[in-house]
């Protein structure tokens, strides 16, 4: 059965409403704007316009990335009122491919732990067992995916922050080669920075299948002028 972007988004929003109170994975919602974007996506689909590979796909983003118009904290109480005016570069690539960002998912303070607690939003629980952790630092991302609250997620990883939550929640996560996906707009460093600040961290997708990982990587991977030593072959 063919479904509209609006119907797909509404189904995920209903799932968030149903299961998120006990899991606490999705910590910020932008439902109204997302619904408007879904309606626009449906109109574009009906007009037979050229569509991106993620056209009309609703998704959430780890709260370590800046997302335009949605509170973006990095799990840091000092940044709890930060509402970016731009997207992180990796987020923008998803948006340019047609994705509709409808929320943010929980992280530990500055993405610096293998669990997902911070003083702003509290603790994220593993949807398979609410007494256990989904891991970290992309624990909110993995928990939201495993609980059917989102079909795709963008995470980040230094020492297991994508891989551990994917393992704990029975998902697929990929830590790509260093700097083939831009981390400009990742927190840390502080909001609004034009550099990544951390030479070890990489951005990467989490999904429920390897095929979905491949689709996401095709969108996310790109050389950036300021932030792509991996692409500069001499």
Where does each model-flagged region fall?
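Gly/Ser-rich catalytic/binding loops embedded in alpha/beta enzyme cores
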Residues: 2-158
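Glycine-rich beta-alpha junction loops
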Residues: 63-65, 160, 212, 220
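Residues forming well-ordered secondary-structure scaffolds
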Residues: 85-89, 139, 169, 208-211, ...
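Structural signature of FAD isoalloxazine-binding scaffolds in flavoprotein oxidoreductases
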Residues: 163-168
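Ligand-binding "clamshell"
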Residues: 169-175
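A short helix-breaking turn/cap at a secondary-structure junction
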Residues: 175-234
């Amino acid at each position: 059965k063919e479904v509209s972007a609006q119907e797909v988004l509404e189904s995920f929003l209903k799932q968030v409403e149903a299961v998120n109170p006990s899991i606490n994975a999705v910590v910020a919602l932008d439902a109204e704007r997302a619904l408007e974007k879904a309606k626009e996506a449906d109109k574009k689909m009906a007009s037979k316009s050229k569509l991106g590979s993620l056209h009309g796909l609703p998704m959430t983003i780890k709260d370590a990335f800046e997302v335009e118009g949605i509170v973006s904290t990095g799990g840091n109480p000092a940044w709890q009122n930060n509402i970016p005016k731009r997207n992180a570069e990796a987020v923008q690539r998803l948006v340019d491919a047609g994705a509709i960002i409808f929320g943010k998912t929980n992280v530990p303070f500055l993405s610096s732990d293998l669990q997902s607690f911070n003083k702003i939003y509290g603790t994220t629980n593993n949807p398979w067992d609410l007494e256990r952790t989904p891991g970290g630092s992309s624990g909110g991302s993995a928990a939201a995916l495993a609980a059917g609250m989102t079909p795709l997620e963008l995470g980040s990883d230094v020492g297991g922050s994508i891989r551990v939550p994917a393992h704990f929640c029975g998902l697929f996560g990929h830590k790509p080669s260093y700097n083939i996906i831009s981390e400009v707009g990742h927190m840390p460093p502080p909001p609004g920075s034009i550099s990544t600040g951390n030479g070890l961290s990489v951005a990467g997708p989490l999904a429920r299948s390897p095929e979905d990982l491949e689709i996401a990587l095709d969108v996310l991977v790109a050389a950036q002028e300021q932030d792509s030593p991996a692409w500069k072959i001499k």
